[in-house]
Amino acid sequence: MRLKTKIRKKWLSVLCTVVFLLNILFIANVTILPKVGAATSNDGVVKIDTSTLIGTNHAHCWYRDRLDTALRGIRSWGMNSVRVVLSNGYRWTKIPASEVANIISLSRSLGFKAIILEVHDTTGYGEDGAACSLAQAVEYWKEIKSVLDGNEDFVIINIGNEPYGNNNYQNWVNDTKNAIKALRDAGFKHTIMVDAPNWGQDWSNTMRDNAQSIMEADPLRNLVFSIHMYGVYNTASKVEEYIKSFVDKGLPLVIGEFGHQHTDGDPDEEAIVRYAKQYKIGLFSWSWCGNSSYVGYLDMVNNWDPNNPTPWGQWYKTNAIGTSSTPTPTSTVTPTPTPTPTPTPTVTATPTPTPTPVSTPATSGQIKVLYANKETNSTTNTIRPWLKVVNSGSSSIDLSRVTIRYWYTVDGERAQSAISDWAQIGASNVTFKFVKLSSSVSGADYYLEIGFKSGAGQLQPGKDTGEIQMRFNKDDWSNYNQGNDWSWIQSMTSYGENEKVTAYIDGVLVWGQEPSGATPAPAPTATPTPTPTVTPTPTVTPTPTVTATPTPTPTPTPTPVSTPATGGQIKVLYANKETNSTTNTIRPWLKVVNSGSSSIDLSRVTIRYWYTVDGERAQSAISDWAQIGASNVTFKFVKLSSSVSGADYYLEIGFKSGAGQLQPGKDTGEIQIRFNKSDWSNYNQGNDWSWIQSMTSYGENEKVTAYIDGVLVWGQEPSGTTPSPTSTPTVTVTPTPTPTPTPTPTPTVTPTPTVTPTPTVTATPTPTPTPIPTVTPLPTISPSPSVVEITINTNAGRTQISPYIYGANQDIEGVVHSARRLGGNRLTGYNWENNFSNAGNDWYHSSDDYLCWSMGISGEDAKVPAAVVSKFHEYSLKNNAYSAVTLQMAGYVSKDNYGTVSENETAPSNRWAEVKFKKDAPLSLNPDLNDNFVYMDEFINYLINKYGMASSPTGIKGYILDNEPDLWASTHPRIHPNKVTCKELIEKSVELAKVIKTLDPSAEVFGYASYGFMGYYSLQDAPDWNQVKGEHRWFISWYLEQMKKASDSFGKRLLDVLDLHWYPEARGGNIRVCFDGENDTSKEVVIARMQAPRTLWDPTYKTSVKGQITAGENSWINQWFSDYLPIIPNVKADIEKYYPGTKLAISEFDYGGRNHISGGIALADVLGIFGKYGVNFAARWGDSGSYAAAAYNIYLNYDGKGSKYGNTNVSANTSDVENMPVYASINGQDDSELHIILINRNYDQKLQVKINITSTPKYTKAEIYGFDSNSPEYKKMGNIDNIESNVFTLEVPKFNGVSHSITLDFNVSIKIIQNEVIKFIRNLVFMRALV
């Protein structure tokens, strides 16, 4: 059977060649016969069946020399198709017809069923100014039609890749129809593939909802639709729902791209593959090889070698390809596992003579070094330079001949050790040698020499070694000061060329520049330097000491100049986003324009923003978002040696290689920038050279200067400075294609929580930050005493536990929450009349139907008023949960779903409907969509009419006065561009609360939904806070007092629940435990995460010295605002003082680690704290997680049968708060059943626990439930059958398996005194004691 198949393919290939030749000779009346994968309709049209296609993408237009290698490798894996990237010449080098013919011929010869050809230059049209339109792509297809004709059975024409971004994507429908018509009019009969808008992910459902009309626009009905699945498709339900929407209508669909992770989120790749197979649709991964470094994880193979798959490639090969296709024979590949780091070896350095000076760097040898800095703190106990070695020559090089030198100062003589945690060439093939200079030179008294064993092999021309992860330290873990190290570049956190890391072949310097005062390495010798013998160091990792970014080294002040430079190749557009002259944050947003006639590599460009520091402090800068990628933007603070007019500093903005080429006439798109001082003290912008207060929209600002290769080409430096060197004539640069064929990030699928970001460059927009501290060492966890005394008294401390503390903003899979909140940034701009909302800074200020999409509301259902709220509340009713719904108070809501709202469309404009709290007219159940107003009283009345009053069984119980008003100017500048004032917030809160209480007196009013501590403290530096604060120490107390006064005047309580958000700022190893550290499981972060809940309640867990952390968590709040800690007692004291009877809600919170046991421990602790300390309502923010679910269910369903923790808190105390918190409860006033939550959060210390219970009944037995590090499944773990006198003891050994690699096993035995031993792995125990 297999032989017959081969013969048939051979003759079909011959026949295809004949048909192709006949077409070239213009011989008419030839009937094209269908081949494998094709079918012929009655009218002779060949329609390719895409349902059985499985393949990957090949980035041909950037790797034209890899065609044969790539296609053969792809076919060898058994894939039967490939999607090939072409260019029409608009952005990249045009792929000529002859080359396309070769692609087709080679693909046929390899036995592919069909191939897809696509034009990549359309990517992101409408949003990316460098992209071309579909109409321009059609012209290319016409140009190469001659080589496509006759291949209708084999070639699918993918008109253009991801032909719209997120701007103007509503035009996609007509543009696509017009492109199809143009191709058919030109005589194309091929199967045409149509890519979705929204960077291919169709989160707006534009393609889905218009697919039928698109199909009908094709006279041949020979179309297939292509969806790209990345972060938008992060759950199985979203994947299946989208696929079924096409399958159910009989419309052909292909998944043209997908990955296992991406910059925009975590796709559910398992569901994508499963449903593609189940519903029989074509499937193509991204991509074979050649992705840029920041998305290098999407490569299927290493170095184009099919026998060297990456983890992503191996997964796809095993799970997607499997045995579904007949592959070309290939050897079996066994993936090499990532090595577990071994203990760091100690190496004693050997002094060598100090070399003599040299001035010329060597940068033209056969190799070069790419460097990425993985330790950005200048003061640190561990230096982390990650490297790649590139063969830039024309012949292979044996890596054993290569050495690299990293130059630094030791800052205190000690033995040192180095290790490679992982290397693509094999960590065991990397060697280290510490070399001490006989005397110090500039920036170094040591270098670390990195070498390679013979096992590292040959490095081929144009290739690199792949990543080499390395770190080194001193034996006593004392600190280095990297700030003065020759080789350290603080801002280069992604790979780039660092000429201060030098490279040698046979000992001869071939790359980089040694420190001043050093000579090139001596002539080569035949004997390589031996690797020293090493001895292991102890298997401990101390907590690193970290400090803030130091003040930069002063540079000489230049001399005067009067003439600006404005005739260069680039210019700068500037928009001022902080109009207050006195501010703690400067916000210059920029665009760089190529005003020349040739392209320019952005890595050659720097921009300087000149200003006065107004009080010397360490400073930090961040790009919240940039169209070229925020991670591609770098910052450097430069201090002048003496002040000049308008400046004593400048911030230098640079660009990494990933920013790519800037084409003539194009701009970079928006670059959002902000910077601040470490103590958040104010700048006075009024005297700053570069600040133009009134220029809030983009315009030319010649006082923001620009440079190419350090030469001033735009603008005027401050008076008293000299310009950069005079510019020479501009050199025409031939564009080098940046190999970034991956999709531009797409929107996240859940509303982004309001966060307080750290000053590191990120790719996702974030709101205004709160202060980042000068960080001091993380306090060491104290050894636990030999016996932890737990005392429980069921007759004391009885308080009711609110059932509403177990709530969520996003339901956790496997948990039935008792309370639910409809909130977040999306709700500020939600229009209940049409169900549209605006994303604000979270996603391009897009107005769309995202909320409907995320809830599965479509078609006519999406047009029903308040459909989003109804879907939310009906789910709450189904689960008997409390609903808290956000009302709109910022002033405007989305009027349309047309995508991005530009700055010049800021409200008021025709993109917005104005919010009014009272209609002052009869309320309607059919709101007027054309009156330009949205009424809150009409909204509430609609909900009451549908579900009843709050006092009824089905009514909505709580209404929230909008979301995080302290950040409106940051999160929603198109709605509320100016900072909210204290006066405005109170006036709006009072007015809207009166509306609620008038319509539904029993409904609870939540306010003011503050985002975090600086919102508590000063309403995020509200412009009028200092004028209104009086004797109040923080805004919370003033707000409570004002709401109490208004309530007394109105005659009804206007604030039932003080609503706050809390995301801990605690850090371990300078990584925050949530957000950027969400998935971090290093020892430092795990300890910090498990201890972080103490800031909520523990008065001993804080520093005693302002500005210096002597105790408590490592956070800027503890460092500078410890008087306000712990949070819950401080807030409740002010409630009692200023508005007694007000309840407390924490309606957003998260502690990270949702899929790690440390996250489960922290969350279980937090829920216990909420119950014990009287929080009324709480809702976690964040995606589902296995250990997050376990933490909730230990309270809500600990036995899997619906059994719950009690509803009355009783006294429970521990002698060791640091290591073992405890919570206890009973049901009502009946203490015949006692529930105990016992948490062991000690990382590695032996514990013995004695539990002593005071109660009227005598307990005789107990059941133990819990979850462990092996599995988040909560389960029964044992029984205690003979408790005597209400006392029993547990013996808890220290954690097992803690090694230098910092992995956690949480192995614990529980020993009952009465000679009964129950062994299990756990870190959290739930016990139910019974009489």
Swiss-Prot record:
Residues 1-41 form the signal peptide. Optimum temperature is 80 degrees Celsius. GO terms for molecular function: cellulase activity; cellulose binding; mannan endo-1,4-beta-mannosidase activity. InterPro entries: CBM2/CBM3_carb-bd_dom_sf, CBM3, CBM3_sf, GH44_cat, Glyco_hydro_5, Glyco_hydro_5_CS, Glyco_hydro_b, Glycoside_hydrolase_SF. Residues 781-1331 are annotated as: Catalytic (endoglucanase). Optimum pH is 6. It catalyses: Random hydrolysis of (1->4)-beta-D-mannosidic linkages in mannans, galactomannans and glucomannans; Endohydrolysis of (1->4)-beta-D-glucosidic linkages in cellulose, lichenin and cereal beta-D-glucans. Residues 319-363, 515-566, 717-780 are annotated as: Disordered. Transmembrane segments: none annotated. One of its GO terms (biological process) is cellulose catabolic process. Its EC number is 3.2.1.78, 3.2.1.4. It is an enzyme of class 3 (hydrolase). Residues 42-325 are annotated as: Catalytic (mannanase). The active site is at residues 162, 257. Keywords: Carbohydrate metabolism, Cellulose degradation, Glycosidase, Hydrolase, Multifunctional enzyme, Polysaccharide degradation, Repeat, Signal. Residues 363-516, 566-719 form the CBM3 domain. Residues 521-541, 551-561, 736-756, 766-780 have a biased composition (Pro residues). Residues 323-335, 721-735 have a biased composition (Low complexity). In the N-terminal section; belongs to the glycosyl hydrolase 5 (cellulase A) family. Degradation of hemicelluloses, the second most abundant polysaccharides in nature. Contains two catalytic domains with mannanase and endoglucanase activities. This is Beta-mannanase/endoglucanase A. The gene is manA.
